[in-house]
Amino acid sequence: MELLQKILYANRLAKWDIKPFDAWLFVCFVLLGSFLLSSLFVSAYSFISGAEQDFESLPFVLASGFGLQLSSILAWYLFKQLAIYEVRDQPVGCLAAAKVGAIGFACVYLTLIPTMLIWRLFLDTIGIEYEFQLPVLLVQNGGSPVEMALMICLIVIVAPICEELVYRGFLFRYLNHRLPRGLSILVPSLIFALMHLNLYSFMPLLVLSIALCIVYRASGNLVSSITVHALFNLVNVLMIYLIEPIEL
């Protein structure tokens, strides 16, 4: 309990003194890069394979997904080259951050289970039908061993790293100390949940994102939030395999 309280109230992130112009520059890099890299990866696969572009097929979803996610790393690299700022954070080491992340995941998942059940019951009550997301259907229906390995890599490794760079490493870090603590956590969490474009996953993702902000704030090291995010996605992938496949 004492360790949990330390995680909840600790703050190893100093105020990030970057210029508003640099912040907007990073946002532009992310938006433009995601469009360009995603289109480039899809076009490259279409050219190499000779297949027509089909965004309901696993190979093209993979190409688009990798382009979309890796654009965050490219945006972060360009931002680091151009922005000038002093780092005054006090991060813990990577192993300690991973430990914070593992503890955070265990705690938040216990919260997510009732959250998912109550949220789904609420949406069912007001007449909103559940629809399986395309990536879920594609994972369920499978593909070649290489395609499935790439899909799992994208979901469990690439997406957590790239999304944490944007939502926690940039957005939350920028708002931390500029807004009250609650708002600095809520704003990036709302954006994170909305960007997944799925009403059924909105509330669980909002709760998850709040936890991701808290563990990052507590450790000052993105490894903590990446650990939580990766474990969450891994559990979801395992659960998808346990659900009866639904034909597209």
Please give the residue ranges for each predicted region.
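Membrane-embedded alpha-helical segments of multi-pass transporters/permeases
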Residues: I73, Y77, I113, L117, ...
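Transmembrane alpha-helical segments in integral membrane proteins
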Residues: S71-K80, C153-N176
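N-terminal, membrane-interfacial amphipathic/helix-forming hydrophobic leader that caps
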Residues: M1-A106, L234-L248
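Hydrophobic core segments of transmembrane alpha-helices in multi-pass, intramembrane catalytic enzymes
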Residues: G67-S72, M151-I155, L205-L212
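Functionally important transmembrane alpha-helices
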Residues: G182-L248
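Juxtamembrane helix-loop-helix connectors linking adjacent transmembrane helices
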Residues: Y45-L58, I84-A159, H177, I246-L248
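Hydrophobic alpha-helical transmembrane segments
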Residues: W24-C28, V61-A63, A98-A102, A106, ...
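Membrane-interface helix/loop boundary segments of multi-pass membrane proteins
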Residues: C162-V187, R217-N221
